[in-house]
Amino acid sequence: MKQYEYLFNIHSLYNLARYAFLKIESNYARTVETSSITLPQLRVLWIIKAFPGISLSSIARIGCWSSPTVSNIIKILMNKKLIFKEETINRKVYKFQLTEMGKWFININRQDNNKKFYLFDLIGLFSHEELDFIINIFTEIIIKEKKEFIFEYIEKINEMNVKIDLTNFDTNKVSIIKKTINIYNLLRTFILTVKSNHREPLKVFNVTYAQLRALWIIAAFPGITSSELSGISFWSPSTVHVIVKNLNSKHFIHKEKALIKNAHYLDISPEGELLIIEDYNRNQKTLLIFEELKDISSQDIVNLNCLLMRMNNRLGNYKTEEYINKTFAIIKNRAFGD
């Protein structure tokens, strides 16, 4: 297998996993927000339920967040009286517990057949053998990322049924749902770990991870509007506005006023294209941010990609394959030269 074919499969794996995760996550977030809580806030409640008396640093580790991010979420949850903290001998360290109201919020956000929950759309998409294959590959990846602690969390939330009310499902479907939840959590850990690993190497280019993702989308779809960028990226319009403003100020993109009111057509500049190719050569072509994928066989990666593509299609991520092909066409043309 030629190097660019192998790297295409790595590129595909990452983006197929990323877009499947983002589609499920965005749907989950919208569903949860109807109860006046955000998904990250609910996730902290799950973690505390699984590990009563847990510390802030351990919540950050399990949730794949920074400590300042968790600190802000904790403040909000305490103000809502959904959690409380126990003082310890070391007054600088606190242990967090759920209040009765916190437990209630977990219960009302358990998903069932009456809610449009995308994880349910995946029931019947894969056989048990295919589900096990996906789980085994991502388990191997997570172990190499040294995130084994996530397995205990996944096991506990499956035992507690904090995410889904399984009352009206038969035994076979319960097994499939639990495996699907497992995959969702493994995808999340993998994607957020790669994002974290990529953040530091990007500092030399003076861009954030989100700005890099936006540049790739703009490169793949020349003339894209901000609203279209929002849809493909799963970012809010306000987030896209900030990202576009920053990229434009750094001369990495061009903006041209569109016929639609308050809209602009976006194109990547030569400086922006040079940046994404330099980042690819330095951090992705070398597998610097994909170290955990090195020992997975090429055939397993191909097989996994087929399953992840099926997942994206079921979730309605029809642009994913086009995005992968267009971005890798740019990579092949600029980074390989054959």
Indicate where each model-derived feature is located.
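C-terminal regulatory/oligomerization modules of transcriptional regulators
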Residues: 1-5, 128-181, 299-338
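Charged, amphipathic alpha-helical coiled-coil/dimerization segments
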Residues: 78-132, 246-302
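Residues within the DNA-recognition helix of helix-turn-helix
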Residues: 73-76, 239, 243-246, 307
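A structural signal for well-ordered alpha-helices, especially hydrophobic packing surfaces
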Residues: 21, 106, 142-146, 191, ...
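N-terminal helix-turn-helix DNA-binding core of bacterial DNA-binding proteins
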Residues: 26-69, 197-236
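N-terminal leader segment of winged-helix/HTH proteins
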Residues: 1-35, 152-205
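Residues within the helices of the helix-turn-helix
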Residues: 57, 75, 94, 227, ...
